[in-house]
Amino acid sequence: MFTGIVQKQGKIITIKKESKSWRFEVEADKFLKDVKKGDSIAVNGVCTTIVDFEKNKFAFEAIEETLKKTNFKKLKKGSLVNLEKSIKWNEKIDGHFVQGHVDETGKIIYIKNDKKRTRITISLSKEMRPFVAYKGSISINGISLTISDVEDKNFSVDIIPHTLKNTNFSQLKRNDIVNIEADMIARYLHKIITTK
């Protein structure tokens, strides 16, 4: 479980493509100080398992299903990724509960910058529409955000300068692909309401 508060930006340094999975190595400096092999790390909002690590880098693997559901296939050497360690139950929660189970990817439709915020508009599938509500929570590339606008086929989030500076949102451009995870509470409520 995660909170959607990005702790570090990592850099992809190698990608090894195998028949049934891809192996990624991520440079992360001091981020790895208290981790061990087998720990869970959210990478762009995807719950991954550390399969190997050294002082300043770690490796994780993604199977075909993960590659299909996320933006991992779009990563390349030098790409920046958002990182977060799994929460401990005695820690303060500043964002919202993020499971690291990406529901789908969305395409950046529009980016509008001003001094106080950056508004990013993202495509929305018919299947995700029931879980996306004005002022509700959503995870985009592992970042806990509040939905600022919803339309039939897209939604928008507003990014403050601090978030823009400390996440890979600063690298986003139109038509880029991002990982989307619906708020788990919204999903469970929808299940309760629609189940007879």
Which residues fall in each region the model found?
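Conserved loop->alpha-helix
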Residues: 1-196
